[in-house]
Amino acid sequence: MKSLASYYFLYYLGQAALMPYLSLYLSEKGISSTLIGLLLSLWALTSVIAQPIMGMLNDRLNDRRQILMLCTVLAPILAFGFYFFDAYFALLIFSVLFPWFQSSSGSLSDSLAVEIGSKAGFSFGSIRLWGALSFSLASFVTGIVYERTGYGSIFFYFLFINAGVLAVLFLFPKIKASEHKLSMFDQAKQVISNKRFLRFIGICLLVNLSIAINFSFLPIYFKTMGFNKAWIGTTYAIAAIIEVPMFWVSAKLNSKIGRLPVLCMAAACYAVKCLTLAFTHDVYLVLASQLLDGTAYAFFASATVEMVKSYSKDETQATFQTVFAAITTGLGGIIGSAFGGILIDHMGAPFLYLILFVLCITAAVLFVISYKMSSRSISHNHLQNS
């Protein structure tokens, strides 16, 4: 457990050191906003394609750490492409290569962690909280550091931290792949034929759309509502801080009341937060609502990873995790970024959050229905066996 906790602490420390500042670095470098937008769209599209492929490859290897190690080594090296090159064509190439490995590392980490945790007897949430802790700490420190050292230093910090991540990976127990290896076609077939898993993805996509839109457009919401933009950083920090204890709480709740009820609670928290932003004109109430945001994210992130594992077989664990991440986070981010901007331009920011409320409350109801269907199925099987 200590090696996993160290891994998540360092992994999200690295993410916090690089990802929030990469677009800002490109802007400081003189890259136009139009091209930056194109590069970000290309990153998102690449992640949707890369994650399932890397997951399928991971499930076929004898040691499930290998692909993750490869991602840990190549991601910081490829990130330097943005540091050394200015040509548009070169930036486009690195906008495919870098996110191919960077985006895959997150879902592969979760797949490995939940597998180790299930065998060692601890929950995913109790490990993931260390990532939330390091990310929240880094959120306060990195901006101050980069103002002094320059934004070009983000790549060196990312490389240095990833060296630590790689060292910790060698401490992980060697997880062998299933002896029953499937072809990539059969792996894809297992995903497509699993109707319960596909329904679960559909419900989670409603929540992830809300997460993606809120993350991208919260600063614009502040601007359109006339709030002091100096509070924007504080809103993200509040959510990040509350995530730490809430990941611990989610681990307890997952084992006590079940994952689907926890997911229902997460969707309900998001719904209340979005409804608040749709109608309030008080910036302090918006700041307070971020407590719900951080709570919802911790509940949602911890429960979904464990739910996805329950749908998969031993030979397709990484495949299911990466497909889930590609669709809900990757595709959800693309759709959310596109339609969020359109809704704000035509209907205004409060109306956007009213739509997000509808999405989240719909997801909460669907999680309740799924829970009741699951309970009936378990009761029916119990009666048949007895």
Which residues does each predicted region cover?
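Helix-loop boundary and gating motifs at the non-cytosolic
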Residues: 1-44, 197-235, 301
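Helix-to-loop junctions at the C-terminal end of transmembrane segments
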Residues: 49-63, 146-147, 245-258, 344-345
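Structural signature of the two symmetry-related core transmembrane helices
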Residues: 66-80, 159, 261-276, 357
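Cytoplasmic helix-loop-helix junction between adjacent transmembrane helices
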Residues: 96-130
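A membrane-interface helix-boundary motif in multi-pass transporters
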Residues: 144-160, 341-360
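Juxtamembrane intracellular "pre-TM" segments in multi-pass secondary transporters
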Residues: 172-204
